[in-house]
């Protein structure tokens, strides 16, 4: 048996070596420098599993802002630092609008949806989603009113704890429900079984997507399939998809061509009732688009709001300055409105610094849609490219104290809010986050509303410095599960 195993491993290594030698079909390609790959494993031995972004930043110190890394057999180009990322994502060519094939997302979405599709299907889904969100009032008063309604419901939950410790994850209920209200036309009671099930499933999916097993599956799909590493997340995704399909079908009888729509799902159904020769808005892709919106719209904003609260508990001096500004501008009785942002420069600076500091999504890969000139190199069509957002948000040439939580990064000498070109938590270019405007609106109104009403403190016996700001292992850099106290302000 041992001899057979050694023979198998030897053949596997030989196969990997032969594949690596035959991998580059484009003799004209001019690849950036990078570490020499090992057979089969490539450069995986140089990357820390829990901190791949930091490992890639360390490699850039040796090989420069544009370098090549081998993820298994996959030759991938990494962009680090603001200048390299900006040139690639916001340049005139926009050649990096595609996504590379990622094994688990190919199985989940089969080329559909918004975030991991490419080409005509992606363009149609994205353009539709942008129009639908605009028509539903994103960034304007109709959605702002929904957010403030949800703020009241969230405050009711926090009041029930009477200043005692509450789970940090509770803060994610409000952003999730705002997303559901836009998608399905109604908010859910926090005890609604559908709401509870969806939040639980989304949490499990996000943890599984960030697991070592799924990362191994994405690099070696054949090995992952052999070990069934992808099965748990596919089962959970199918449970989410079943709920979404039920919600979508419940709306179908109520949607007629030409009628005003009150939700994203209504708009999807109505679009599918019209001329759709490519089937871009047939049921399967409608569910895929809704799935993408559910997963992205709940996890990212929910995690950011939790981080904001956690960092206020860890930095009581910053929290105090935010509350002093809120009291001075709003007073004790008036809830914040969208138009208050300009009058609250320190609050805005703190929110921006939260997003910079946490680097929620360190890197989501792009792919060259054609042979592409990048940083003096020629990359063949289909090359995966990682714009490393962590390296932008921590770029020492752009930020005075990149490793520290410092709201001053977004303030001038007179205390006025300053927009920073290197602030790219939502990425840039044609693949910029489709929900950026909604996320910004939610975060401002919820964060300002919570700090207007509560002091966010560590639990009794826990010092501010003891609050854990180490990210949990998941698809995003979400905070670890812990508790805070929301003490009503006088």
From Swiss-Prot:
GO terms for molecular function: all-trans retinal binding; all-trans-retinol binding; heme binding; iron ion binding; monooxygenase activity; oxidoreductase activity, acting on paired donors, with incorporation or reduction of molecular oxygen, reduced flavin or flavoprotein as one donor, and incorporation of one atom of oxygen; retinoic acid 4-hydroxylase activity; retinoic acid binding. Very low levels are detected in fetal and adult tissues. Highly expressed in several tumor samples, in particular colon and adrenal tumors. PROSITE patterns: CYTOCHROME_P450. It catalyses: all-trans-retinoate + reduced [NADPH--hemoprotein reductase] + O2 = all-trans-4-hydroxyretinoate + oxidized [NADPH--hemoprotein reductase] + H2O + H(+); 1-(9Z-octadecenoyl)-sn-glycero-3-phosphocholine + reduced [NADPH--hemoprotein reductase] + O2 = 1-[8-hydroxy-(9Z)-octadecenoyl]-sn-glycero-3-phosphocholine + oxidized [NADPH--hemoprotein reductase] + H2O + H(+); 1-(9Z-octadecenoyl)-sn-glycero-3-phosphocholine + reduced [NADPH--hemoprotein reductase] + O2 = 1-[11-hydroxy-(9Z)-octadecenoyl]-sn-glycero-3-phosphocholine + oxidized [NADPH--hemoprotein reductase] + H2O + H(+); 1-(9Z-octadecenoyl)-sn-glycero-3-phosphocholine + reduced [NADPH--hemoprotein reductase] + O2 = 1-[(9S,10R)-epoxy-octadecanoyl]-sn-glycero-3-phosphocholine + oxidized [NADPH--hemoprotein reductase] + H2O + H(+). It comes from the Eukaryota. Its main location: endoplasmic reticulum. The keyword Cell membrane applies. Keywords: Cell membrane, Endoplasmic reticulum, Glycoprotein, Heme, Iron, Lipid metabolism, Membrane, Metal-binding, Microsome, Monooxygenase, Oxidoreductase, Signal. Its EC number is 1.14.14.-. Its cofactor is heme. It holds the Pfam family p450. Coiled coil: none annotated. GO terms for cellular component: cell surface; cytoplasm; endoplasmic reticulum lumen; endoplasmic reticulum membrane; intracellular membrane-bounded organelle; plasma membrane. It is found in: Endoplasmic reticulum lumen; Cell membrane; Microsome membrane. The keyword DNA-binding does not apply. A cytochrome P450 monooxygenase that may play a role in retinoid and phospholipid metabolism. Catalyzes the hydroxylation of saturated carbon hydrogen bonds. Hydroxylates all trans-retinoic acid (atRA) to 4-hydroxyretinoate and may regulate atRA clearance. Other retinoids such as all-trans retinol and all-trans retinal are potential endogenous substrates. Catalyzes both epoxidation of double bonds and hydroxylation of carbon hydrogen bonds of the fatty acyl chain of 1-acylphospholipids/2-lysophospholipids. Belongs to the cytochrome P450 family. PANTHER family: CYTOCHROME P450 2W1, CYTOCHROME P450 508A4-RELATED. This is Cytochrome P450 2W1. It comes from Homo sapiens (Human). The lineage of its organism: Eukaryota, Metazoa, Chordata, Craniata, Vertebrata.
């Amino acid at each position: 048996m041992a001899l057979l195993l050694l023979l198998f491993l030897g053949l596997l290594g030989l196969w990997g070596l032969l594949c690596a030698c035959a991998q580059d079909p484009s003799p004209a390609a001019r690849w950036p420098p990078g570490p020499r790959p090992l057979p089969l494993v490539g450069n995986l031995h140089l990357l820390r599993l829990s901190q791949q972004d930091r490992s890639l930043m360390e490699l850039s110190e040796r090989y420069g802002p544009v370098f090549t890394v081998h993820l298994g057999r996959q030759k991938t180009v990494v962009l680090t630092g603001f200048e390299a990322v900006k040139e690639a994502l916001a340049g005139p060519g926009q050649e990096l609008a595609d996504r590379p094939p990622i094994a688990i997302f190919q199985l989940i979405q089969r080329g559909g949806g918004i975030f991991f599709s490419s080409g005509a299907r992606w363009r149609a889904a994205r353009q539709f989603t942008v129009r639908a969100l605009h028509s539903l009032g994103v960034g304007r008063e109709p959605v702002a009113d929904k957010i403030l309604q949800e703020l009241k419901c969230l405050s009711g939950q926090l009041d029930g704890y009477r200043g005692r410790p509450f789970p940090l994850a509770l803060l994610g209920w409000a952003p999730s429900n705002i997303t559901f209200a836009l998608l399905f036309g109604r908010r859910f009671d926090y005890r609604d079984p559908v709401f509870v099930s969806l939040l639980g499933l989304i949490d499990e999916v996000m943890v599984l997507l960030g697991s070592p097993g799924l990362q191994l599956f994405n690099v070696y799909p054949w090995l992952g399939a052999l070990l069934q590493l992808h099965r748990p997340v596919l089962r959970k995704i199918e449970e989410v998809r079943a709920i979404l399909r039920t919600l979508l079908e419940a709306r179908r009888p109520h949607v007629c061509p030409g009628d005003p729509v009150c939700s994203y799902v209504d708009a999807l159904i109505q679009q599918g009732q019209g001329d759709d020769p490519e089937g871009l808005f047939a049921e399967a892709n409608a569910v895929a688009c809704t799935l993408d919106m559910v997963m992205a719209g709940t996890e990212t904003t929910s995690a950011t709001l939790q981080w904001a609260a956690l960092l206020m508990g860890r930095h009581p001096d910053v929290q105090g300055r935010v509350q002093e500004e809120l009291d001075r501008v709003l007073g004790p009785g008036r809830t914040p409105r969208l138009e208050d942002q300009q009058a609250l420069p320190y609050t805005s600076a703190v929110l921006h610094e939260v997003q910079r500091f946490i680097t929620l999504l360190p890197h989501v890969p792009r792919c060259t849609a054609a042979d592409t000139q990048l940083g003096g190199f020629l990359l063949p069509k289909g090359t995966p490219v990682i714009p490393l957002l962590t390296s932008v948000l921590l770029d020492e040439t752009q930020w005075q104290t990149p490793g520290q939580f410092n709201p001053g990064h977004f303030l001038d000498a007179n205390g006025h809010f300053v927009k920073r070109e290197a602030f790219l938590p939502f990425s840039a270019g044609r693949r910029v986050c489709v929900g950026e405007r909604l996320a910004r609106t939610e975060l401002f109104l919820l964060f300002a509303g919570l700090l207007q009403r509560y002091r966010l403190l560590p639990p009794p016996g826990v010092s501010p410095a003891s609050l854990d700001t180490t990210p949990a292992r998941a698809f995003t850099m979400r905070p670890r599960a812990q508790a805070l106290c929301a003490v009503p302000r006088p």
